[in-house]
Amino acid sequence: MEKILNYINGELIEPSSKIYIENIDPSCGKAYSLVPDSCADDVNEAVKSAKAAYSFWRKTTKQERSDILNKLADAIEENFDMLVAAESRDNGKPLSLAAKVDIPRASANLRFFAGAILHDSSDVHEMDGEAINYTLRVPIGVAACISPWNLPL
């Protein structure tokens, strides 16, 4: 049975607990892989890695970030059939739905943000001729999100 690993600091690694959970195919009720039962130690390692990467990431240009997002979208499209099969098996949905909605949406979302970042702007507002208020949109650090959403990416 396939064993899924955590991806932390550019490496696929076992959870620190060495504990895995069966991943069940909802269409038949049978386990088809094992997923990490990650704990606080794994989260802390991921955050530590993200903070270390931030010093590099914050220096990338908008164009470089856009290019990275587009490369991710390219990778999704290049692996379309494999991702459709994985999404269908993971969620028990028809292959046709994963192929028509889920996987195209994942690459489309990345391409949307790849374009949006190039058109981001800052605002400037004059205050009664005595001051100027302005906003700058720049990376400020590591953020985490646990999204209760069942579409990929």
Would you name each region that the model predicts?
Residues 1-28:
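Hydrophobic face of amphipathic alpha-helices that form TPR/SEL1-like repeat modules
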